[in-house]
Design a protein with these regions (language model features):
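Short acidic-glycine-tyrosine-enriched beta hairpin
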Residues: 50, 96-113
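Short histidine-centered beta-strand/loop micro-motifs
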Residues: 72-77, 119-121
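Glycine- and acidic-residue-biased ligand/ion/polar-headgroup-sensing regions
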Residues: 78-96
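A short glycine-rich, His/Asp/Glu-containing loop-to-beta-strand
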Residues: 32-74, 130-132, 136
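Hydrophobic micro-packing sites on short alpha-helices
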Residues: 1-7, 11-15
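Ligand-binding loop in jelly-roll beta-barrel domains
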Residues: 45, 54-56, 103-104, 112-137
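Charged, helix-prone or intrinsically disordered regulatory segments positioned adjacent to compact structured domains
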Residues: 9, 18-45
Length: 137
């Protein structure tokens, strides 16, 4: 996020392109093989964009946190509303000084203001579906 801010671009600008969408699917359907991917090298965090574009109001991202990895100590600030669903594994969610342990199937909604941190303290990868609005990444 800091690099994107320094370059005055969104983080999505750095996403690697997946393969080309089939005719008639562009902007509507995202096949697993066509997802835009972002690997935070050396951090153990990998993200895939599930939304067909950033031109809408909602953004879907799938984040995979390797064991012992997270978003860092500083936390991430939100630009709007954000919620998530733990698809697999265990995730520590830190909000305003409180720690919540979330397991597969648990969901959460983050307050509009403030910041949050995530950490995977388990021995298995944690996969989280993030939903945010507006669609800014």
């Amino acid at each position: 996020h800091e690099i994107a801010q320094a370059l005055d671009v969104t983080v999505s600008w750095f996403f690697q392109e997946g393969t080309q969408a089939k005719p008639g699917e562009a902007g509507l359907i995202v096949r697993k093989s066509t997802r835009k991917k972002f690997d935070f090298h050396g951090t153990g965090v990998h993200e895939e964009m599930l939304s067909p574009s950033l031109s809408g109001q909602i953004l879907l991202i799938e984040s995979t946190f390797a064991p012992g990895t997270g978003t860092g100590d500083r936390g991430r600030k939100r630009q709007g509303e954000e919620a998530g669903l733990v698809l697999s594994g265990v995730l520590e969610l830190h909000l305003e000084g409180e720690k919540f342990i979330l397991q597969e199937g648990d969901s959460f909604a983050l307050p509009r203001e403030g910041s949050h941190r995530c950490f995977n303290s388990s021995s298995e990868p944690a996969v989280v579906l993030w939903i945010s609005t507006p669609a800014a990444y």
